[in-house]
């Protein structure tokens, strides 16, 4: 089985890491579209065009069977278009884990950390409206401009990143938020910093494991056998932080090279 995974940068590697836990027999091609990062601060038309171009590239060069849109912003902008226009593919998107957050919270106060584009998207608003009937909760939504790029540069444990998070999180802490949705695939990489500010009891919801399970289920339905060896290739369209790749994937045996899309 050949699987394409993409994000504007390295955040989607948190999803890839989850996939590597469950998928045993696959060729995986990860594209970090760093020449256009971050998607979360780009307009939806450009994001849609990049998603289409990347999908066409993965189909032409690697004949993928499945596509994982490992980015909340790209999912909001393009997932319907990709499913409609690439019907031969298994297409799985990434959306904020609001439902598990609603089911988990004890205080009924939930924080949402996401990019500006995700929070403004129709898809996000539709998701919130659909889930509002499960249980009455208070959502504390926080757009985080610049945070994905801080993480992309490897500034995970820096004072600057801490101060950014502190400004956004202290109001949530004061409001007795007990569950936070990490609405960007970059954000699991700063989980420890979030816990330093919010306390160790805070529940953080990220969607990588759910995506991996969904991929495994759909691949088995298609008849793909989950035995054999894994091969992972990381492709990037612009500059990339090699140390971050090694740290996130924990020195998995991977090939890294630049591509033109």
Curated annotation (Swiss-Prot):
Pfam families: Asp_Glu_race. GO terms for biological process: cell wall organization; peptidoglycan biosynthetic process; regulation of cell shape. The active site is at residues 71, 184. It catalyses: L-glutamate = D-glutamate. InterPro entries: Asp/Glu/hydantoin_racemase (IPR015942), Asp/Glu_race (IPR001920), Asp/Glu_racemase_AS_1 (IPR018187), Asp/Glu_racemase_AS_2 (IPR033134), Glu_race (IPR004391). Substrate binds at residues 7-8, 39-40, 72-73, 185-186. Pathway: Cell wall biogenesis; peptidoglycan biosynthesis. Its EC number is 5.1.1.3. One of its GO terms (molecular function) is glutamate racemase activity. The keyword Isomerase applies. It comes from the Bacteria. Gene3D superfamilies: 3.40.50.1860. The keyword Isomerase applies. It is an enzyme of class 5 (isomerase). Keywords: Cell shape, Cell wall biogenesis/degradation, Isomerase, Peptidoglycan synthesis. PROSITE patterns: ASP_GLU_RACEMASE_1 (PS00923), ASP_GLU_RACEMASE_2 (PS00924). Belongs to the aspartate/glutamate racemases family. Provides the (R)-glutamate required for cell wall biosynthesis. NCBIfam families: glut_race (TIGR00067). This is Glutamate racemase. It comes from Aliarcobacter butzleri (strain RM4018). The lineage of its organism: Bacteria, Pseudomonadati, Campylobacterota, Epsilonproteobacteria, Campylobacterales.
